[in-house]
């Protein structure tokens, strides 16, 4: 009895399976979220890379033919010389358009230039980006216009995501005097954000506890970034210490140097 012959799937079968996978999985990831009765945006992104072009010209020029006649081509007229090969031109980076927010890369709709290894091994297979073809650029421009009109859900910017990540690792210290009666308000907290952490925070984006803060202790404050993400930052209210001037620090350094200098014995 002859052994059964197992044949490997052909290119057509593999192409059909890949097409079903893209239609079922990746295309769903590329679809933006809408608000209310917003019009649906056609998100049939092009998932194929632009093919290069090879430009050639004839080595021997074809002589002009008579009116109404076709030019006579000989064997030498089928010899071509290469002018430009855009298909095999070396490219350092890969231009992609992000379909989702990617840490340290960008947000949806950003045109980024990344290494080929990052684009082909992570961004493209996971549906996080598509090739920056003219068709995809046009689709994202239409999506950007709809987002500006408020017909699509807002997304956080790259700077906003970096701010949120930074605030999650911060702790704010607010110094208040002990010789006057005081109550902490958003304006004071916003000034200390800029003074101590270097972050510009508008007072209307801050939220403090409902009970008035009139004593030293451990509290919290919430910061809303671009009206989308809210971060709770630990806050310590401590006694205010006046910063020492440069002159005072110089005098302290001189006193310390004198104390460390060896004294000569008296005769």
Swiss-Prot record:
Key words of the record: Mitochondrion, Ribonucleoprotein, Ribosomal protein, Transit peptide
Source species, domain of life: Eukaryota
UniProt key word Ribonucleoprotein: yes
Residue range covered by the transit peptide: 1-52
Protein name: Large ribosomal subunit protein bL9m
Family: Belongs to the bacterial ribosomal protein bL9 family.
One example of a Gene Ontology biological process annotation: translation
Major localisation: mitochondrion
GO molecular function, one term: RNA binding
Gene Ontology CC terms, in alphabetical order: mitochondrial inner membrane; mitochondrial large ribosomal subunit; mitochondrial ribosome; mitochondrion
Subunit structure: Component of the mitochondrial large ribosomal subunit (mt-LSU). Mature mammalian 55S mitochondrial ribosomes consist of a small (28S) and a large (39S) subunit. The 28S small subunit contains a 12S ribosomal RNA (12S mt-rRNA) and 30 different proteins. The 39S large subunit contains a 16S rRNA (16S mt-rRNA), a copy of mitochondrial valine transfer RNA (mt-tRNA(Val)), which plays an integral structural role, and 52 different proteins.
Localization in the cell: Mitochondrion
Entries under InterPro entries matching the protein: MRP-L9_N, Ribosomal_bL9, Ribosomal_bL9/RNase_H1_N, Ribosomal_bL9_N, Ribosomal_bL9_N_sf, Ribosomal_bL9m_C
